């Protein structure tokens, strides 16, 4: 399971012109599920997202987590993050999970996030989405479980 974490001042996701998820300060995370993933990887990713210290403290040092600052968490499924780009001029998606497994594990991740954190939003799995964000820093990390 991969998560592209971006620290944001605000972000929203639209589907067909309708806002389906939005946060103020927090983390926008693009999530890709891979064929061998399970709930264990989803649990590990969520733990890291909630506790990874990417927000600045009073001294300007990245020392605070999403939980510490009470920020929002916007989860967006994006199977293209699992692409194999090593060969040729076209990405291969054979390294992405089948849609049924992807949907199951993304929904599980979202359910667990809602149970463990107050401010959680998401896009729609498999939908054509427009993601708007104000990247803060920019601060971006690729997490792989």
Curated annotation (Swiss-Prot):
InterPro entries: Daa-tRNA_deacyls_DTD, DTD-like_sf. A motif (Gly-cisPro motif, important for rejection of L-amino acids) lies at residues 137-138. It catalyses: glycyl-tRNA(Ala) + H2O = tRNA(Ala) + glycine + H(+); a D-aminoacyl-tRNA + H2O = a tRNA + a D-alpha-amino acid + H(+). Pfam families: Tyr_Deacylase. Signal peptide: none annotated. One of its GO terms (cellular component) is cytoplasm. One of its GO terms (biological process) is D-amino acid catabolic process. It is found in: Cytoplasm. The keyword RNA-binding applies. Its EC number is 3.1.1.96. One of its GO terms (molecular function) is Ser(Gly)-tRNA(Ala) hydrolase activity. It comes from the Bacteria. Keywords: Cytoplasm, Hydrolase, RNA-binding, tRNA-binding. Homodimer. PANTHER family: D-AMINOACYL-TRNA DEACYLASE 1, D-TYROSYL-TRNA TYR DEACYLASE. An aminoacyl-tRNA editing enzyme that deacylates mischarged D-aminoacyl-tRNAs. Also deacylates mischarged glycyl-tRNA(Ala), protecting cells against glycine mischarging by AlaRS. Acts via tRNA-based rather than protein-based catalysis; rejects L-amino acids rather than detecting D-amino acids in the active site. By recycling D-aminoacyl-tRNA to D-amino acids and free tRNA molecules, this enzyme counteracts the toxicity associated with the formation of D-aminoacyl-tRNA entities in vivo and helps enforce protein L-homochirality. Belongs to the DTD family. A Gly-cisPro motif from one monomer fits into the active site of the other monomer to allow specific chiral rejection of L-amino acids. This is D-aminoacyl-tRNA deacylase. It comes from Pseudomonas putida (strain GB-1). The gene is dtd.
């Amino acid at each position: 399971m991969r998560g592209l974490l971006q620290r944001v001042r605000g972000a929203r996701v639209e589907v067909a012109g309708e806002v389906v998820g939005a946060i103020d300060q927090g983390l926008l995370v693009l999530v890709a599920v891979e064929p061998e993933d399970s709930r264990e990887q989803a649990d590990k990713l969520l733990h890291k997202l909630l506790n990874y210290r990417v927000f600045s403290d009073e001294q300007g040092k990245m020392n605070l987590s999403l939980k510490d600052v009470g920020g929002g968490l916007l989860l967006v499924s994006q199977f293209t993050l699992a692409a194999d780009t090593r060969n040729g001029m076209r990405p291969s998606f054979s390294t992405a999970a089948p849609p049924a497994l992807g949907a199951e594990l993304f929904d599980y991740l979202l359910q667990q996030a809602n149970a463990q954190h107050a401010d959680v939003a998401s896009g729609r799995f498999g939908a054509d989405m427009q993601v708007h964000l104000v990247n803060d820093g920019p601060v971006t990390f690729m997490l792989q479980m």
